[in-house]
């Protein structure tokens, strides 16, 4: 299948640069995956599409302020590191900018010396393995010195860091937010629970690969990046019981979806586990556990629009995106939402 089949026209002004004042007032496009019928709602109306006994699956990862800007020891030359994943206690795989400054053995300082770093390895893909030196707890040091790694298409400064976190974020480790979850408020989640709808959590730490363009012509030739996931025994039992009852599993976001589909066996059962996934879901894939999906509007030719098209049908999804552009929906991380029912 050709990557170009997932291209669409998107005016730049529809790329949301900031979140709405109230999370759940974003617009919601409801797409019937069987008929292709579209309705236009607000996100707080999502509760009307969930039934007692259904389970909503949320990704509780938390975005780290993983962008560090510092100086090279001795010369004062600027360096920027973006932390991607921890490889040992104080060693992280990072992107470095400018790369030529980040050679093995080079040392850097951040925040008046509160944090120091040394490049210990350059990987084949150009990423650096960096060892950090500090006093106290690394996460607290990072919290005081780091900046949020916003997506490349967001050009405005984010005034409130928490607006790039879900209200239920808990497990530190992501380089990007699981953006479908940004629409939920604590009040809306309480209302959902009060209606007898279950809430289960997965953890998938979103990597920067989520923003990387597909650089091949044929979908089947694309290789996905790997991301760490975890599912607890308790949450696995809630999901399995939902399927057994004949209720629906509604996945919030492509990250929750990829986690569940990685873990599920052929009968759609999930179990407590953790690991790394590079699952690539594109048309032809048969879903094992996810019945419905809440998601944002994604980039043209992205692996995310391919996943959405797998659940709802490519023709239905491309028609829906055309309608979203016509109706001036807001796109990408801080944009509006779609519910595939």
Swiss-Prot record:
**Which pathway is recorded for this entry?**
tRNA modification; tRNA-queuosine biosynthesis
Q: Which keywords belong to this entry?
A: Cytoplasm, Queuosine biosynthesis, S-adenosyl-L-methionine, Transferase
Q: Its Enzyme Commission number?
A: 2.4.99.17
This protein's superkingdom?
Answer: Bacteria
Which Gene Ontology MF annotations are present? S-adenosylmethionine:tRNA ribosyltransferase-isomerase activity
Q: Which GO terms describe its biological process?
A: queuosine biosynthetic process; tRNA wobble guanine modification
The record's subcellular location field reads: Cytoplasm
For this protein, what reaction is catalysed? 7-aminomethyl-7-carbaguanosine(34) in tRNA + S-adenosyl-L-methionine = epoxyqueuosine(34) in tRNA + adenine + L-methionine + 2 H(+)
The answer to keyword S-adenosyl-L-methionine applying to this record is yes
Main role?
A: Transfers and isomerizes the ribose moiety from AdoMet to the 7-aminomethyl group of 7-deazaguanine (preQ1-tRNA) to give epoxyqueuosine (oQ-tRNA).
Q: Which family does it belong to?
A: Belongs to the QueA family.
Q: Assembly and partners?
A: Monomer.
The name under which this protein is listed is S-adenosylmethionine:tRNA ribosyltransferase-isomerase
Q: What is the lineage of its organism?
A: Bacteria, Bacillati, Bacillota, Clostridia, Eubacteriales
UniProt lists the gene as queA
């Amino acid at each position: 299948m050709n990557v170009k089949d997932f291209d669409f026209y998107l005016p730049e002004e529809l790329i949301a640069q900031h979140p709405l004042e109230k999370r759940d007032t974003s617009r919601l496009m409801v797409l019937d995956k069987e008929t292709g019928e579209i309705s236009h709602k607000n996100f707080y109306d999502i509760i009307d599409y969930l039934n007692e006994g259904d389970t909503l699956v949320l990704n509780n990862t938390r975005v780290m302020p993983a962008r560090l800007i510092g100086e090279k020891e001795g010369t004062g030359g600027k360096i920027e590191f973006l932390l991607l994943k921890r490889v040992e206690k104080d060693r992280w795989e990072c992107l470095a900018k400018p790369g030529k400054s980040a050679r093995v053995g080079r040392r850097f300082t951040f925040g008046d010396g509160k944090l120091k770093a040394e490049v210990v390895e350059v990987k084949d893909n150009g990423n650096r393995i960096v060892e950090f030196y500090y006093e106290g707890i690394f996460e607290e040091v990072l919290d005081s010195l780091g900046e949020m790694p916003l997506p490349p298409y967001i050009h405005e400064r984010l005034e409130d860091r928490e607006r790039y976190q879900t209200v239920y974020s808990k497990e530190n480790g992501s380089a990007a937010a699981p953006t479908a979850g940004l629409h939920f408020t604590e009040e809306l989640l309480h209302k959902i629970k009060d209606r007898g709808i279950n809430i289960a959590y997965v953890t998938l730490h979103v990597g920067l690969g989520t923003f990387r363009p597909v650089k091949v012509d044929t979908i089947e030739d694309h290789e996905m990046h790997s991301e760490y996931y975890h599912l607890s025994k308790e949450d696995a039992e809630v999901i399995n019981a939902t399927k057994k009852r004949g209720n629906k599993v509604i996945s919030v976001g492509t990250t929750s979806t990829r986690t569940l589909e990685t873990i599920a066996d052929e009968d759609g059962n999930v179990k407590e586990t953790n690991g790394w996934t590079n699952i690539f879901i594109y048309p032809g894939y048969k879903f094992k556990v996810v019945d419905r999906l809440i998601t944002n509007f994604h980039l043209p030719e992205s692996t995310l629009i391919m996943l959405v098209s797998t659940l709802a049908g490519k023709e239905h999804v491309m028609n829906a995106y055309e309608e979203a552009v016509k109706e001036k929906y807001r796109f990408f991380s801080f944009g509006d939402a779609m519910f595939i029912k």
